[in-house]
């Protein structure tokens, strides 16, 4: 069965969580940078390995419009895996949003943007870019 994004527009996260008996819900530490934002769409998964953010750029290239980048950063909070530039590219490509169990940067710009971003935290430091991660694999992001 295929669902359209509009099928989910009026369904709350609490209703989904209840229907799924609390399974596959995000950890409470992952929060929207803009409280008015919500996101729905097919997940395009990204697995971060050894704090390498190069795989995020592969995901931006490969993800289909309407998809949500779900970045499994293993809970890392000492570096930011994306910021304002990545969000601008994701928005231009028509992605639905970004969710990460790690950190982003450029919090002021991201919180004022009309693009849904859900993060564990904010930190200005960037990681390495040597391409160790993977895309479109099973990931565990935020719980």
PLM segments and residue spans:
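Feature captures the catalytic cores and cofactor-binding loops of soluble hydro-lyases/lyases
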Residues: 1-143
């Amino acid at each position: 069965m295929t669902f359209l994004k509009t099928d989910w527009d009026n369904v709350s996260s609490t209703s989904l969580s209840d229907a799924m008996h609390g399974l596959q819900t995000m950890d409470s530490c992952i929060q929207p940078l803009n409280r008015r934002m919500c996101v729905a769409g097919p997940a395009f998964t990204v697995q971060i390995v050894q704090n390498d953010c190069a795989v995020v750029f592969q995901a931006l290239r490969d993800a289909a419009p309407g998809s949500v980048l779900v970045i499994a950063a293993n809970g890392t909070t000492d570096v930011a895996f994306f910021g304002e530039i990545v969000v601008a590219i994701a928005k231009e490509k028509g992605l639905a949003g970004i969710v990460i169990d790690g950190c982003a940067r450029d919090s002021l710009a991201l919180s004022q943007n009309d693009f849904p971003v859900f993060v564990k935290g904010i930190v200005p430091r960037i990681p390495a870019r040597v391409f160790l991660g993977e895309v479109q694999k099973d990931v565990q992001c935020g719980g």
